[in-house]
């Protein structure tokens, strides 16, 4: 369960933050440092092999390698050879992590896989101790200051959240207006260390929305797309095997996607691609891999404004999931997950219902943009139109590391396990 904090945190008035009347009068136009960095970000995708990044993976590796020791990352393991497929998958080991000691990464090249694993480990390091000073206020008090409903955040089941509950809140940024906002610290500080005190179930804390990037805009798009991905998977979890939503593997697929499916086929994989694009109109895909010799039925999903990037992410994540099972090194895969994923009823349902797939890749939406900031603006606007609330982000960047790391929350979107 997410950690709490002591009662010594100051309130808003103690720290000199404006009250509700001032915010209402000024239209909450207080912008944040994160927003200033975003508005100054003119970066554009310069690397586009299955992904869209501001610089090449090799350049990112040069930037982050000097930081690994300070973050406690002791090893980068290549686990690609444990499977038959051959797509690069790496694991970054951080023994003193307060949540997961093993972070995974995947890609179409070795450099992509290495960057993916190392950046995930660095993200975990950044979220264990949030640098911003928090304030302590009740939910009811904060509701009058916020442009979103705290009850629309991911809640525990059951949740004892009420207006009288005091919480620690950290500064955040409204991604539509740039206005200063607040989010519960419990949601974005991931620390599973056990303390000698009781924590009442309130929120469902997870790494969903935690993201990094070469630039602020790149990191924010990554985080928001991850939140949307989980929303799409949860929203259509009951209909994931609906043949009407399956993508036909035909000539309409881009060449890169055909090459990936050919690689999987040569490894003996049965592949099913499901179009889960949700009400925001962003492309989201779910990919299922099955092999007669196991180890299990595995799934991967991906969401991105560019539909090819979304599909590539789903495929590579499914491959990564297989290696998570095979390597057996993840702290978050208990024995029952292995058992359930190999249940004949699950595998049979997938094979039977996917046989009639008839949806085409070209039917999935796609969004084009030349720079990260306008692309983010478009995605934020779509979420805001659907939920009636703007996504918010916490700036987790540390001056001594210099890497853009953010935690994105989108009140009103669904957070449900895809399993």
Regions found by a protein language model. Name each.
Residues 2-419:
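Helix-biased "structured C-terminal domain" signature
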């Amino acid at each position: 369960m997410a950690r709490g904090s002591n009662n010594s945190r100051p309130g808003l008035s103690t720290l000199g933050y404006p009250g509700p009347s001032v915010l209402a009068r000024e239209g909450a136009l207080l912008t944040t440092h994160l927003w200033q960095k975003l508005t100054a970000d003119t970066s554009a995708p310069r690397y586009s092999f299955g992904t869209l990044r501001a610089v090449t993976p090799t350049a990112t590796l040069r930037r982050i390698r000097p930081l690994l020791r300070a973050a406690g990352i002791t090893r980068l393991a290549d686990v690609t050879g444990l499977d038959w497929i051959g797509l690069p998958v790496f694991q970054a080991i951080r023994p003193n992590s307060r949540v997961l000691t093993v972070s995974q990464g995947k890609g179409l090249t070795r450099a992509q896989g290495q960057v993916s694993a190392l950046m995930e480990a660095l993200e975990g390091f950044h979220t264990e101790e949030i640098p911003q000073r928090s304030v302590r206020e009740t939910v009811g008090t904060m509701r009058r200051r916020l442009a979103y409903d705290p009850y629309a955040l991911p809640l525990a089941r059951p949740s004892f959240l009420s207006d009288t509950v005091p919480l620690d809140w950290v500064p955040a940024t409204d991604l539509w207006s740039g206005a200063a906002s607040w989010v519960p610290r419990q949601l974005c500080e991931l620390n599973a260390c056990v303390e000698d005190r009781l924590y009442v179930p309130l929120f469902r804390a997870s790494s969903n929305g935690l993201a990094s990037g070469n630039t602020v805009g790149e990191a924010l798009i990554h985080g928001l797309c991850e939140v949307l991905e989980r929303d799409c998977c949860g929203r259509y979890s009951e209909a994931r095997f609906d043949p009407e939503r399956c993508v036909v593997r035909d000539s309409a697929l881009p060449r890169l996607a055909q090459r990936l499916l050919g690689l999987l086929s040569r490894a003996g994989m049965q592949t099913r691609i499901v179009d889960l694009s949700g009400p925001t109109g962003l492309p989201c895909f779910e990919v299922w891999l099955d092999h007669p010799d196991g180890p299990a039925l595995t799934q991967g999903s991906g969401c991105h404004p560019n539909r090819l990037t979304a599909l590539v992410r789903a495929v590579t994540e499914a491959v990564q999931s297989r290696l998570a099972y095979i390597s057996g090194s993840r702290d978050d895969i208990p024995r029952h997950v292995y058992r359930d994923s190999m249940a004949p009823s699950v595998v049979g349902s997938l094979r039977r219902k996917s046989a009639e797939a008839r949806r085409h890749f070209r039917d999935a939406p796609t969004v084009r943009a030349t720079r990260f900031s306008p692309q983010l603006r478009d995605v934020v606007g779509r979420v805001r139109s659907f939920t009636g609330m703007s996504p918010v982000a916490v700036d987790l960047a540390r001056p001594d590391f210099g890497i853009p790391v953010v935690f994105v929350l989108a009140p009103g979107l669904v957070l449900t396990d895809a399993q």
